[in-house]
């Protein structure tokens, strides 16, 4: 490999890392705004109906610059994209409920268990082999989850299970994309991923219409813009990274740094020693899995 090739790879790697870090920041802003919204009197379907169109606008703009809208949403088969969309209904509902009752940092930490579920699901669905070191990381990582959960019957917060379920569902969705990637483009999958929950939200909204105050509406729109930008930056980062995704993937954990900062500044969230220990185990094992899985 000549010097010029090394410089190009180094430049692409740096840009991809920056894109991942920006996407993590955008996702953290989205979650912080969603927590504020969830503390009000509106339901998850009010949020998705008011903010969803802005997500669609950004997604459609992305399609226009990626082969056109028709090319991305007109498919030979709609079964798999619609199945993913149906699975995705649970995520906005659970995120809305969870953020109302648990801290931003704990929510983010448990969402970042996604690599654990990807490994497990890849083994059973894609028949991928798992290295022993990854198995050890999974065990230690889930011990970290148990430490955070603190499963004492008297004080157990059942809402803390929701982000874990979200990670499992997201893992299934990502495995489906991996297995059936020829059926649709990433933007096509994302479109139907948003469309199905949005249509359900519209039906529920018609039955119980509600428009919050202007400030909350601005927060809702902003959360959707930041969430969609996070998805855009993340998608583009992986598109650029090609053969070194294992070197950029660990940077998704920078989202936890922002979650801790935003949680403390805006919601006075403080984490106890158990949450700190559990979070460290999850992050270290998650990074280890992301590196080893592609290695």
Question: Where in the sequence are the language-model features?
Answer:
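C-terminal transmembrane-helix exit sites in multi-pass transporters
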Residues: 95-97, 115-136, 255-276
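Helix-helix packing/entry segments at the starts of transmembrane helices
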Residues: 107-113, 181-195, 232-264
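Hydrophobic/small/kink-forming positions within alpha-helical transmembrane segments
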Residues: 24, 28, 60, 85, ...
